[in-house]
Amino acid sequence: MSEEGFMLAVLKGIPLIQDIRAEGNSRSWIMTIDGHPARGEIFSEAFSISLFLNDLESLPKPCLAYVTLLLAAHPDVHDYAIQLTADGGWLNGYYTTSSSSELIAIEIEKHLALTCILKNVIRNHHKLYSGGV
């Protein structure tokens, strides 16, 4: 089985991941993770999953700087990065293809939890600075 096929089978076996399908080529996928828009891409011996954080309008530079510092300052948060696209901000998590299915599932649960926390931070930051509180 190819590396792409193996990873697709692993991801399809994780209950939180739904609606997974190839996007353009077999090395990238779009999906939902517990209802959150997500995408994945496989590299040599690694893959990334990105969970959608927010559109760019609700992610101004001061908020983006704050969220980035939260990620950088926490000693237990690693292998995550914010990616900005035309769609908005995404939280990328990086994983090795040699990890067990169980470990990948656990790490994706942590990734989802961190995404939810950051979405809440962004929402509160937006309310505070847009006069919504």
Curated annotation (Swiss-Prot):
| Keyword Transport among record annotations | yes
State the UniProt keywords alphabetically: Cytoplasm, Protein transport, Secreted, Transport, Virulence
An annotated GO cellular component of this protein is: cytoplasm
| Transport among keywords | yes
Induction summary: Highly induced 6.5 hours following entry into host cells. Induced in macrophages. Induced when residing in the host ileal loop, when in an acidic environment, during phosphate starvation, and in low magnesium. Repressed by methyl-3,4-dephostatin.
**What is the top-level taxon of the source organism?**
Bacteria
What's one GO BP annotation on this UniProt entry? protein transport
User: Which compartment or compartments is the protein found in?
Assistant: Secreted; Cytoplasm
Q: What does this protein do?
A: Virulence protein that plays a central role in mammalian macrophage infection, by inhibiting phagosome-lysosome fusion and cellular trafficking. May act by disrupting the function of the mammalian HOOK3 protein, a protein involved in the cellular traffic.
**Binding partners and assembly:** Interacts with the mammalian NIPSNAP3A and HOOK3 proteins in infected cells.
Q: Which NCBIfam families match?
A: PRK15368.1
Q: What is this protein called?
A: Salmonella pathogenicity island 2 protein C
The organism encoding this protein is Salmonella typhimurium (strain LT2 / SGSC1412 / ATCC 700720)
